[in-house]
């Protein structure tokens, strides 16, 4: 009789225990920085620094048949940020300006011309994402302009209001999502069909940041499952530097503004200078 009674009561007892356990406040891991230390760190770091990855790579296309000087190139990116106001704004936000330039250089041709330059200045706010007294990520609200600086039929430009969140899952994995509202598309009204309305990315790094691997997925326009992909692998040259041997693979459209409606598949290798902790896409 006792055994039958236990059998009847045990599931309910387990359910009650599970509910009680679920109601307990979850402990936030200690490796997340606390808000006060982050605010002090922001005050102490220089207002000028690197923003996204800075790199120079060279490689060739897999979508143009055999390797030739016509489908091989060099690509480099320069990305900087500047905090415009030192003091903390309401809601613990920071006003900052960024500038990113991405260039495609046909170094294997005789005259070594620059094929395309894309300029991407932004103005926006950044703020920490918190849980309790810990900082678990960062968010951005920005106005972005991107163009190739040309005129006439070669002009390409668009403007966006972007919202981005970066969340650190644990010391190894970081995820981020970015969505935008495009406007002023008169130079290229169909660009969102190829560059989309948003992107997601994930990054894995070893605890000492010696190795990093990232994957970026940009959902193109439309309801079908189409996307642009970029995969990065980086190995740090020494334990005290932020310089990496860098491998990048791009597959999709809109790698450059001039060819936003042409498909490309490029594998390139070179060197990169990366921000500490995580890369911003």
Predicted features, each with a name:
Residues 83, 126, 236, 250, ...:
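Solvent-exposed residues in well-ordered beta-strands and their adjoining turns
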Residues 21-22, 50-63, 70, 86-207, ...:
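Outer-membrane pore/translocation modules
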Residues 19-61:
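N-terminal regions that are enriched for targeting/export leaders
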Residues 264-281:
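Outer-membrane beta-barrel "beta-signal"
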Residues 1-37, 278-281:
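Cleavable N-terminal export/targeting peptides
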Residues 212-243:
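Glycine/small-residue-rich hydrophobic helix-like segments
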Residues 232-234, 240-246, 254-255, 263, ...:
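Long, compositionally biased interface segments
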Residues 70-77, 83:
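Long, low-hydrophobicity, solvent-exposed regions enriched in small/turn-prone and acidic residues
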């Amino acid at each position: 009789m006792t055994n039958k009674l236990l059998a009847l009561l045990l599931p309910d007892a387990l359910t009650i225990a599970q509910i009680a356990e679920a109601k307990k406040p979850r402990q936030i891991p200690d490796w997340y920085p606390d808000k006060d230390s982050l605010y002090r760190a922001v005050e102490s770091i220089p207002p000028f620094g690197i923003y996204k990855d800075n790199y120079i790579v060279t490689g060739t296309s897999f979508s143009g048949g055999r390797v030739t000087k016509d489908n091989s190139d060099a690509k480099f990116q320069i990305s900087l940020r500047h905090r415009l106001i030192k003091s903390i704004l309401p809601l613990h936000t920071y006003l900052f300006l960024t500038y990113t330039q991405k260039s495609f250089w046909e170094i294997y041709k005789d005259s070594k011309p620059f094929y395309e330059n894309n300029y991407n200045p932004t103005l926006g706010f950044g703020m920490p994402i918190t849980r309790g007294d810990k900082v678990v990520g960062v968010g951005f609200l920005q106005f972005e302009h991107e163009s190739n600086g040309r005129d006439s039929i070669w002009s390409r430009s668009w403007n966006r209001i972007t919202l981005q969140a970066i969340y650190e899952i644990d010391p190894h994995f970081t995820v981020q999502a970015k969505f935008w509202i495009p406007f002023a598309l008169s130079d290229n009204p169909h660009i969102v069909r190829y560059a989309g309305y948003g992107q997601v990315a994930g990054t894995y790094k070893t605890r000492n940041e010696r190795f990093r691997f990232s994957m970026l997925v940009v959902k193109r326009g439309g309801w079908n499952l189409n996307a642009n992909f970029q995969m990065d692998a980086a190995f740090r040259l020494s334990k005290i530097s932020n310089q990496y041997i860098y491998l990048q693979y791009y597959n999709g459209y809109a790698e450059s503004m001039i060819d936003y409606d042409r498909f490309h598949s490029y594998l390139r290798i070179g060197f990169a200078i990366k921000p500490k902790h995580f890369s911003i896409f």
